[in-house]
C-alpha cells in the first residue's frame, strides 16, 4: 500500500517571484506528499547544481521546465513501484540515475523535490508527523530561532557588507515565547529605524534593509531595539551574524566596500574578533571565504572556544567537505540546507557526522523560499537545537515559525525548547 504509483512535478514561483520545482508523490492507497524546493541568492561554489533552463525569453533564463521534465520523465519512470518508506534506496537510486558528483544532469532541484515529497508521503502513510517519521521517538527538541532582522550583502540594496544580523531569544522557555520576543524586537526596530528617517523596506528574508553606514551601526540599532523592547542583550537575547564572506573575498582580500576596508585574512579575523569583544555575538556564519581554509583555521583558533563558527558556503551540507573541515579544525558548526546536497538521506548523514565530531548544526532556509515548512520538521527531527528561517515578516518565513508552534503543541509536555542550552562556555 505504500508503493509509489505516481510522481508529478510542476513549475511554481518562490518568494522572489522566480520559478522553482514542486513535486507530488502519490502512493497506492491515495496518500500524497508534496514538497517545494528552495533556492539561494548567495550560493556556495560546491553546492549541488540547481538546474535552470537558461532561456532568456522565459523568466529571464530562470525557468525550471527541464528539471520538471526530469522528474516527470526519467525519475518517475525509475521510481514508480518503489516503496515510499525505503527513503535511502530511493535517494541512492536517484543519485545513481543522475550519474554526476553534483546532481548536475537531472538537477538537485528535481532530485530534492522527489526526496522530500517521498518522505512526506511515507510519513502520512504511517500516520506520523514528518518530524516523528524522520527523527523517531526521541525527536522533541524545539530549536532556538536565528531571526534575521537587518539584511545587507546579497539580500539587500544597501552598503552593509555583512549579509544578516540576527537575534536569538535564548531566555524563552518555548518556541511560542521565542517567536513573541522576536516579533516584539522586530517591531521595535521598525519604529527605531523610522524615527531615524531610515527605510523600513524589507529584504529577501523579511529583515529590514536600511541605508546604514557600517556593521557597527547595524549592531547598535539591534541592541537599542532589544533594550527598548524590554529585553537584556547578552542575557535574554544573543546576536548572530551571517557574513557571507565569500561574496566579498576577492584576490585574497576581504573587500568591505561599504566601509572602505580591504582586509587580509588575518585582518578579517581581527575585525570579527573586535566585534565579538564589543557585542554579545554568539554565532558567526561564513566569517571567511569558502576557499580560504587557512583563514578559517585562524578564525577557529581565535574564536572557536567562545563563538559558534558556522560553515555554510564552506561545507555546503556535503559530508565530504564537512569531513575536511573537521580534520583541519576549521569551524565548529554546520549550516544545514537541504538543497545544497539534494537529498534527505545525505542531509541527515551530514548532520550525524557533525554531531559525532562535536559540531553543532543549524537547520536553514534559503533566501528564495515557499510556503513549504519541511525544515521546521527537520529541525525537530534532528534535535539540532537551532533554526535559521528569516524574519518576522513574509509568509514564506512565518510558515516555518507557525509550523514549529504547531509541533510544540503536538509534543505537549515532552517538548523541550533548546533555549540557553545552545550557549557555549
Curated annotation (Swiss-Prot):
Q: Which residues are involved in binding Mg(2+)?
A: 242, 285, 312
Q: Active-site residues?
A: 205 (proton donor), 337 (proton acceptor)
A Pfam family cross-referenced in the UniProt record is: Enolase_C
The question of whether Cell cycle is a record keyword is answered with no
Cofactor binding: number and manner? Binds a second Mg(2+) ion via substrate during catalysis.
Sequence similarity: Belongs to the enolase family.
Q: What is its EC number?
A: 4.2.1.11
**What pathway annotation does it carry?**
Carbohydrate degradation; glycolysis; pyruvate from D-glyceraldehyde 3-phosphate: step 4/5
What's a single GO MF annotation on this record? Answer: phosphopyruvate hydratase activity
Q: Which UniProt keywords apply?
A: Cytoplasm, Glycolysis, Lyase, Magnesium, Metal-binding, Secreted
Q: Name one GO biological process term.
A: glycolytic process
User: Mind naming one GO cellular-component term on file for this protein?
Assistant: phosphopyruvate hydratase complex
Species of the source: Jannaschia sp. (strain CCS1)
Q: Where in the cell is it found?
A: Cytoplasm; Secreted; Cell surface
What protein name is recorded for this chain?
Enolase
| Classification of source organism | Bacteria, Pseudomonadati, Pseudomonadota, Alphaproteobacteria, Rhodobacterales
Function summary: Catalyzes the reversible conversion of 2-phosphoglycerate (2-PG) into phosphoenolpyruvate (PEP). It is essential for the degradation of carbohydrates via glycolysis.
**Domain of life (superkingdom):** Bacteria
Catalyzes what?
(2R)-2-phosphoglycerate = phosphoenolpyruvate + H2O
* Chain sites annotated for binding (2R)-2-phosphoglycerate: 163, 337, 366-367, 388
Which InterPro entries does the record match to this protein?
Enolase (IPR000941), Enolase-like_C_sf (IPR036849), Enolase-like_N (IPR029017), Enolase_C (IPR020810), Enolase_CS (IPR020809), Enolase_N (IPR020811)
Question: NCBIfam families this protein is in?
Answer: eno (TIGR01060)
Q: Does the keyword Secreted apply?
A: yes
Q: What cofactor(s) does the depicted protein rely on?
A: Mg(2+)
